[in-house]
Amino acid sequence: MESTLEQHLNDTMKNPAIVGVLCTDQQGHNLGCRGSLSDEHGGVVSVLARQAATLTRDPTDPTPTVCLESDSGNILIRSHGTITVAVHKIAS
């Protein structure tokens, strides 16, 4: 699985609009990262995804997407089962 994850991270970074990507487990442990998102962001990313899920409680969409917006870009965070993914995109 590790080599597959590494390949997905590398493929994601090929998009010129993406400057960072991070995958964590449910405890915030880093599974892999590239670019502007690093090991130190894992815990925050995991907690944001978990807290957003408790806020929504929508049975039709149990896994909300968190979007942190700034003038320079967005960080999108979403959980997929036991893995949380964050993608840092520059503003277009």
Pin down the residues of each PLM region.
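Non-catalytic interaction/Regulatory regions outside core domains
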Residues: 1-92
